[in-house]
Amino acid sequence: MSFYGTSMIFDGVSCEEMGLVMYDFTSNRQSATAFASDLEIAEDRIDGRYRSLFYGGAVNAPLTFTMVLCASEDRAERNEPLDRWDLQKIAAWLTGHREYKWLSIVQEDMEEIRYRCLISDLQAVEVAGNKWGVSFQVTCDSPYAYLRPMVYDYMVASSLTTTLRSESSHNGFYYPKLAITGHTGGDLSIRIENRMEASSFTFQGLPSAMGDLTIDCENGVITSASGLNPYQYLSYDTPFHFPRFARGDNTITMTGSGRYTFTCEWPVNVGG
C-alpha cells in the first residue's frame, strides 16, 4: 500500500526540512497490496483425520514497508542532486536510533494515525549517476499503527458506571495508561471492573498519604506521587487483572472517590 501524501515526519523532524518529499515509483496499473500482517496458524495435520489439530492463531509479525524520499521539485529544477553531506545528514536523522520513534504521514486520512518504528536498509536512489533520494525499510514495533492518544476522564464521587468504546483493531485486550488523582480524606478503597470479564482491579485501604497514582496497565507498573509502595494494598479477593479493554464497547464501573484518567493509543490495522 502506498501513501499519496508528499511529506512525512520522523522523530519530530519533517522530510521537508531535509529538502525531501515522498515519492511513489509504482505504475498506475491495477494492483493488490497487503495491508495487514499475516496470521500465524499453529496446527498439525495427521493421516486419517480430515481436520487439523488446531492450537490457535496469532498476529505477531511486525508491520513492515518500504518508503522513498527524493529531492524536492525546486531542487530538481535547480539540478542539485544530493551530495555526501546531504546523505550523512539524512542518515543521522533516520538511522542509528536505540529505541522506537514515531513516524507520521502528512495526508488527510492519516491525521490521527502514526507508526512506532525503526528505520533500516537505507539506500541511495540514483538517476544517471547522481543521487536524488533515499529508500529505506520501516519496521514497526507491532502489526499495527496507532491512533494518537485519546483521553477518557471521569470524576467519581462514590461509584460510576460508564461505557468506554475501544477503537482497537487488535482482537484481544488493550491495556491503557491510568492516573488516579484527587482522592482525599482517610483510607480509600478503589475498584475498577469491566463487565466484559469476571475480574477486577482493586486497592483496599490506601492511606491518604499515598498521593496520586500512575498505572502502566500493560507492564503492571504502579507508581505513587508520595514514593510509598502501593502494591501491598492490591486486593486479590476476586480474579485480578490490571484494567484492560476488549475491542468494541466496554462497560466500566469505577468505585472510590477521585479522578480516573485513562489514556489510550488504540492499535489500528491500516497497513503501510
Give the label of every model feature segment.
Residues 1-43:
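Polar/acidic, low-complexity leader/linker segments enriched in S/T/G and N/D
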